[in-house]
Amino acid sequence: RSRLFVKAVDGSRVEREEMVWQRALAEFRKGSPLCESPIERDLLAGLLTADWGYFHTENAVIHDCRNEEFPDEPVVIAPQLVVARYRLDFALVLRRGKITRTVAIECDGKDYHDRERDNRRDEYLSALGIGTIRHVGQDIHRIPLGCANEIAEGVAFWWEQFPQ
């Protein structure tokens, strides 16, 4: 926990960081039971503490697809969201201004993924306007926040490729 506060130098920043951390922890407690594997839980922790500044928010929030209305937040993480015939490890629903886009986040553990099947799935989702980002389970387990920050940077870059 103390590593999250390394950049904090003045009292107000420490307090703000503490609030951000508390919100991320509450969201993790809400989202963790929805995850189906340890690497998904690891990545969830990273996604909840990643740098989402491009989307003008400090925290992502969890959406439980089973029993909640969709929150009106800039970055929403929906674990196990069903899209047509697929269930995504995570759907990132991103809002900036009046524009909303969805990105599938897949945690590729060596036992459960087949490249050919994954490519078909990615093409299907792409036809629906949903991009896919994949991370290898070993990397997620080793550096979950690093993977999550790569995802945050990747979706910011991806977002810029669309006409506004």
Feature-to-residue mapping (PLM):
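Solvent-exposed, charged helical/coil patches
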Residues: 1-75, 164
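Short, mixed-charge, low-aromatic patches
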Residues: 2-3, 73-78, 103-110
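A sequence-composition feature that detects small, non-aromatic residues
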Residues: 8, 24-26, 45, 50, ...
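Residue-identity detector for glutamine
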Residues: 22, 80, 138, 161-164
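A general structural-boundary detector
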Residues: 30, 34, 77-78, 112, ...
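Phosphate/oxyanion-binding active-site loops and adjacent basic polyanion-contact surfaces
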Residues: 36-40, 83, 144-147
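Active-site metal-binding core of divalent-cation-utilizing nuclease and nuclease-like domains
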Residues: 58-101
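Basic, amphipathic alpha-helical patches used to engage nucleic acids or provide basic targeting signals
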Residues: 86-157, 161
